[in-house]
Amino acid sequence: MAYLTGIWHTFAGMKSATVNEIKQELSSVPPARLVHLCLRMAKFKKENKELLTYLLFEAQDEQAYIDSVKQEMDGLFGEVNTSHVYFAKKTIRKILRIANKHIRYIGSAQAETELLLHFCGRLKDSGLPLHSKTVLGNLYQNQWKKMYKTLQTLHEDLQYDYMKEVSRLEELE
């Protein structure tokens, strides 16, 4: 048993390499070994597998991917249990987790703005009491602020395109 405890401390104390160190090491790895490492990483965690799937198969057509995420969000918004705010809040947070996961995969400010704008629009149109229930209202406000902050980093032409929908959402405030 003491042997296992020693092994556990060795693994628990393992420090991760920096991104720069990993980048340098990967540049020296032969392609066959690199494929093996990627496949092993994909088997290790579901999120790694999903990210690799996005990068290999979906990243070429980003707009189609964004549209598919919006459709997934729309489907989940259709399942929101509006009979009790507690259940609605749980489903809304689940939708937000999914949206944020896809935003991380895409890694684009424009995609983040578009997905958060869609989320805020669907939440506002859901008919849930955003004013009287502070939890839902705060959730909406925080996502709106995050979206607006990201919108400010986009090119002026893109900002103009998104401002029409943003002005509709501002009516809630």
Place the predicted regions along the sequence by residue.
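Short, Lys/Arg-enriched N-terminal segments with co-localized hydrophobic residues
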Residues: 2-13
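N-terminal interaction modules that seed assembly of large macromolecular complexes
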Residues: 15-79
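N-terminal intrinsically disordered, cationic/polar leader segments
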Residues: 46, 112-116, 122-123, 131, ...
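A structural signal for well-ordered alpha-helices, especially hydrophobic packing surfaces
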Residues: 49, 77, 96-103, 124-131, ...
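Aromatic-anchored, charged helix-turn/loop surface patch used as a conserved interaction hotspot
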Residues: 63-103
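Amphipathic alpha-helical repeat scaffolds of TPR domains
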Residues: 70-74, 117-122
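Residues within HEAT/ARM-like alpha-solenoid scaffolds
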Residues: 87-94, 107-118, 135, 139
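Eukaryote-biased recognition of C-terminal alpha-helical segments
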Residues: 135-173
